[in-house]
Design a protein with these regions (language model features):
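Conserved donor-binding/catalytic core segment of Leloir-type glycosyltransferases
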Residues: 11-13, 174-193, 199-202, 215
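A conserved mid-protein helix/loop that constitutes part of the nucleotide-sugar donor-binding site
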Residues: 22-31, 190-204, 353
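Acidic anion/phosphate-binding donor-loop and adjacent secondary structure
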Residues: 130-131, 149, 153, 163-180
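Nucleotide-activated donor-binding/catalytic signature segment of Leloir-type glycosyltransferases, i.e.
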Residues: 230-251
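Nucleotide-sugar-dependent
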Residues: 267-282, 300-301
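Short hydrophobic beta-strand element within catalytic cores of glycosyltransferases
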Residues: 286-293
Length: 364
């Protein structure tokens, strides 16, 4: 991929540094950087210090950040530095969730991003009501067919579908753990984000005779009182009759966590700020951990590789949980299907080929 006599230069526009706090937008941008070596990328780096190891490629632009989390100062710097760098690159690739501030950003697109080509990968949509007040930044990329249809219906025009990637070598298939079953919920403290439904479903499964240990690995968002929210979940679990459970904070080592669990329980009523294709689900499937999800349109892309229950239906979700824990052969079938799905549809080669082709199209 060449632009004239040199490598094309692309700005990866994110709301926080690539070496800061982990998030879907940061993960997607990092994966694009890592899979397209023929591109000269410009990206935001946390300063001073790094919350995680910085990418070894590209041109870092320092963003002052204490913890690498996209607080208001980080977002403001990203917009300011992005406006400056956008005039010095061949293409801008934005990774921005459609949230409260995005409508204003989209209307200021000529001022902030110039008039060059823009790719906008949409990790998720906080509230579909925002879609009525935005303008497309350029060529839009959705993570799922469901979101692509929704964006096209909102006059986003040219919308492509490129699912996220996960490296099978980084997430090897693991054998089923021995011992007492462990069920994992991993998510954010979001309204209707699934934690409460997971607790109620677990209680339903226990009443049906299932025995297991429930782990809730919770992540907070900027401005939340995580300790208070964790305690509220403990109180809800106790009130539901659960005795064998624990509520953890953010888990840094997902490899170790998934190695010790039997399945993922992720039943959000709405995805809110989470990605259409949550990274946690891909990590679980790649590791050979079956998943029980809610029947949201975005999850249709997983097909028969997962179990799905009506969103918000704790009774049906709990019945599926009890059934799967009692069916080791079905567990094996789902574990194999999940791994195969990840390798066939979410691998790095497919991801790189699609973004590479899109870049070539827009830069030609």
């Amino acid at each position: 991929m060449r632009h004239g006599e040199r490598r094309p230069r692309v700005l990866l526009l994110t709301s926080s540094p690539l070496d800061g706090a982990e998030g879907c937008d940061v993960r997607l941008a990092t994966d694009v950087l890592g899979t397209l070596p023929e591109v000269d990328f410009v990206w935001f780096s946390q300063w001073p210090g790094h919350r995680q190891s910085p990418p070894e490629r590209g041109r870092p632009v320092r963003v002052l950040s204490r913890d690498g989390v996209p607080h208001i100062p980080e977002r403001a710097q990203s917009a300011l530095f992005g406006a400056f760098q956008a005039r010095r690159v061949d293409l801008v690739h934005a990774f921005l969730t459609v949230g409260r501030t995005f409508p204003a950003f989209s209307w200021l697109r000529p001022l902030l991003l110039g008039r060059g080509p823009v790719v906008h990968t949409v990790p998720g949509v906080m509230d579909t009501g925002y879609l009525n007040r935005v303008r497309p930044l350029g060529t839009t990329v959705a993570l799922s067919e469901s979101m692509a249809r929704r964006l096209r219906a909102s006059d986003f025009g040219d919308v492509r579908v490129i699912p996220p990637m996960i490296g099978p070598d980084e997430w090897p298939y693991l054998p089923r753990p021995k011992g007492f079953p462990v069920v994992l919920f991993a998510g954010h403290h979001d309204p209707n984000g699934g934690a409460e439904t997971a607790i109620d479903a677990a209680a339903e499964a226990v009443r049906a005779g299932a025995r297991f240990h429930l782990v809730l690995a919770m992540r907070g968002r900027p401005g939340q009182d995580n300790a208070m929210l964790d305690e509220a979940l403990r109180e809800r679990a106790g009130a539901a009759g659960l005795t064998d459970f624990e509520v953890r904070g953010y888990v840094d080592d997902m490899h170790a966590l998934l190695a010790g669990v039997h399945l993922l329980l992720f039943p959000p009523v709405v995805l809110g700020g989470k990605a259409d294709i949550p990274l946690t689900v891909l990590q679980a499937l790649a590791s050979g951990r079956p998943a029980i999800l809610s029947d949201l349109p975005q999850f249709a892309d997983f097909g028969h590789a997962v179990l799905r229950a009506p969103a918000g239906d704790a009774r049906r979700t709990g019945q599926q949980l009890a059934w799967l824990l009692d069916q080791p052969r079905s567990w094996d079938v789902l574990a194999d299907r999940g791994r195969t799905l990840v390798e066939d549809h979410f691998g790095p080669e497919r991801f790189a080929a699609r973004y590479g082709a899109l870049y070539r199209e827009l830069l030609s």
